């Protein structure tokens, strides 16, 4: 029998030390990885609840196990809030991740060997959009589109040309490193021209979409997926959305369970429900507006300091800095910034001469720092410190000076007060 007073402390101190060290790292490092954010304590409370004990294969009202009357209410709340938040007619809250949500979409609507047209990983797409190392590139005939390297914008004429040439069963619109606004009506028109399904992966911008600050793909796409973390600021998980289409809804449900997953993670679904409720609050739009303003201000600092920002700026929460002209690598820049307690990620840029393990760029995002309370003034200062380190890469004195500034800023803006 377990006791309600059981604690990790004193039972598994090695694990607790690692957990505490990570929590401290989050407090005393500045987080600029575009896909990371901080959840509320309410989200954490749901994830740490007794719901983790309950198996609930199936869907609300149609379970394969008994005792699901309460978790049915939990999942129903999450579904209804997701639909309300994004203006969707259908929502599946069970996918364990964004990648599993994408995999379920492919399983539901494609046959092995079908052609998909997605954005190249090297140009800002995601692994699950047809990269050769991913199952999406192994199970399906993946054709890749990219950006115009002169403008840094998606070349929609190329997308259309490739669609006409290859006749894909599905066109995938979405990204992991693209800072401009996707043209969903154009994607829809191209899909209709060749008789393709349009699948939008809005994982990175879901929070902006929910706040009405980025175009909503639901009216244009046959199916939409997202993660529930990143800009949405919830637990790590996936979500599938669609407008009303009974045939597609049945296929999607069957693809998630039993097609791709067994029992849903009810504690995570509860945390998703909390996240959606938080995103429906009026203050969420102000947060997302600040995310965009902070990203735009930071991008301008890099431009003013002589760095190339891919696409010339940003419309959303992230931007890419190319270091090719400076002769620097993303790997070295990432490491130097890490020593100053600034966390970013190295990232490939268009026409990158380096390998994906080295790269010539950095991806920078503002969701996490905005959650801490950073405004434009703090983000401008932060971008300047990053440029100082890049201008003097490997200079320990510069790194130490920046680290002191970072420590002071983190102390002024704790993650959890």
Swiss-Prot record:
The intrachain disulfides are none
**First-level EC class:** transferase
Name the GO cellular-component terms. cytosol
Identify the CDD domains for this entry. Answer: SHMT
Which UniProt keyword terms apply here?
A: Amino-acid biosynthesis, Cytoplasm, One-carbon metabolism, Pyridoxal phosphate, Transferase
Cofactor names from the entry are: pyridoxal 5'-phosphate
Catalyses: (6R)-5,10-methylene-5,6,7,8-tetrahydrofolate + glycine + H2O = (6S)-5,6,7,8-tetrahydrofolate + L-serine
Entry's Gene Ontology BP terms: glycine biosynthetic process from serine; tetrahydrofolate interconversion
Instruction: Name the principal localization, coarsely classed.
Output: cytoplasm
Q: What is this protein's record name?
A: Serine hydroxymethyltransferase 1
Species name for this entry? Pseudomonas putida (strain ATCC 47054 / DSM 6125 / CFBP 8728 / NCIMB 11950 / KT2440)
Gene that codes for this?
A: glyA1
């Amino acid at each position: 029998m377990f006791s309600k007073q059981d604690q990790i402390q004193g039972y598994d101190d090695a694990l607790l030390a690692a957990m505490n060290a990570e929590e401290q790292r989050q407090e005393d490092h500045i987080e600029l990885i575009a896909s990371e954010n901080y959840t509320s304590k309410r989200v954490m409370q749901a994830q740490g609840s007794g719901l983790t004990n309950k198996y609930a294969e199936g869907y609300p009202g149609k379970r394969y196990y008994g005792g699901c009357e309460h978790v049915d209410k939990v999942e129903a709340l999450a579904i209804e809030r997701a639909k309300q938040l994004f203006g969707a007619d259908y929502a599946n809250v069970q996918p364990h991740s964004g990648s599993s949500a994408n995999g379920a979409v492919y399983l539901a609507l494609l046959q092995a060997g079908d052609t998909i047209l997605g954005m190249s990983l090297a140009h800002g797409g995601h692994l699950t959009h047809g990269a050769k190392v991913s199952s999406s590139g192994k199970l399906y005939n993946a054709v890749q589109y990219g950006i115009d390297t002169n403008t840094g914008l998606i070349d929609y004429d190329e997308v259309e040309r490739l669609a006409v040439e290859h006749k894909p069963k599905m066109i995938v619109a979405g990204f992991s490193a693209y800072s401009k606004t996707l043209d969903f009506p154009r994607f829809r028109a191209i899909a209709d021209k060749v008789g393709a399904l349009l699948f939008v992966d809005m994982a990175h911008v879901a929070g902006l979409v929910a706040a009405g600050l980025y175009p909503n793909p639901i009216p244009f796409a046959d199916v939409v997926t997202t993660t529930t973390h990143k800009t949405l600021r919830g637990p790590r998980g996936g979500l599938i959305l669609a407008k009303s289409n009974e045939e597609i809804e049945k296929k999607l449900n069957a693809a998630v369970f039993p097609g791709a997953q067994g029992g849903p993670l009810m504690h995570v679904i509860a945390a998703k429900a909390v996240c959606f409720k938080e995103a429906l609050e009026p203050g969420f739009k102000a947060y997302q507006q600040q995310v965009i303003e902070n990203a735009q201000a930071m991008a301008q600092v890099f431009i003013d300091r002589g760095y190339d920002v891919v696409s010339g700026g940003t419309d959303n929460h992230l931007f890419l800095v190319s270091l090719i002209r400076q002769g620097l690598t993303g790997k070295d820049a990432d490491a130097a910034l890490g020593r100053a307690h600034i966390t970013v990620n190295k990232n490939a840029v268009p026409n990158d001469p380096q390998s994906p393990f080295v790269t010539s760029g950095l991806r920078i995002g503002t969701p996490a720092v905005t959650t801490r309370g950073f405004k434009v003034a703090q983000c401008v200062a932060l971008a300047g410190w990053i440029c100082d380190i890049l201008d003097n890469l490997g200079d320990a004195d510069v790194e130490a000076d920046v680290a002191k500034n970072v420590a002071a800023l983190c102390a002024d803006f704790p993650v959890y007060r």
